[in-house]
Each structure stands twice: as structure tokens, then as C-alpha cells.
Amino acid sequence: MQFSTTPTLEGQNIVEYCGVVTGEAILGANIFRDFFAGIRDIVGGRSGSYEKELRKAREIAFQELGEQAKALGADAVVGIDIDYETVGKDSSMLMVSVSGTAVKTRR
């Protein structure tokens, strides 16, 4: 499965648009508590554990996106948009959502 933020794939023709696909993942409140309480984890202004959790959430969202595209018979997803939103009471959770258009391609 190929993923692209652009509307086309270089060297390939889109032969069918299969539909819009999405994937989401939500990080629970504990990651924020750990993040703010665990300043000791910050090295050079970055938090390794927080970035690791975000990366994991993004991977889950992309996995869901790919599974939906595959179920539609697609071999690629184009025009992908990645969003990060705070949700829940007191914005205590972070949602990573990805969306795009599932397509069938041919070289």
C-alpha cells in the first residue's frame, strides 16, 4: 500500500477512485500527565516518551487507513491529511486522524 500527501503518484496513473478512507488513534490522559510531570525526560527541549507515543498513534491511524483502502480494493491512498486534535474533558486526550482518497493505480 502506497501513501502520499500529494493528489497523484509519480510514474503511475490513477485508474479508479475507490472512496475516502480514514484512520484515528487517541492517546489517553496518562500520556499528558506523564509528559508534564516527567520533565526529566526532556532532552534538548524534546520529550522522547511523548514523541514515541505520538509516533505509535500515527502508525495506528495509518494502519487503519490502509486496512480501509485495502477493503475497497485500492493499492494506494493519495491526498492524505494528518491532523492532531485535543479531545475529551479538559482536552485531556490527543487524537491523531488521517484521511485520504483510496485509489487503484497502474504504471
Swiss-Prot record:
Protein name: UPF0145 protein CKO_02237
Family: Belongs to the UPF0145 family.
Cross-referenced PANTHER family: UPF0145 PROTEIN YBJQ
Entries under SUPFAM superfamilies matching the protein: YbjQ-like (SSF117782)
Matching Gene3D superfamilies: Hypothetical protein apc22750. Chain B
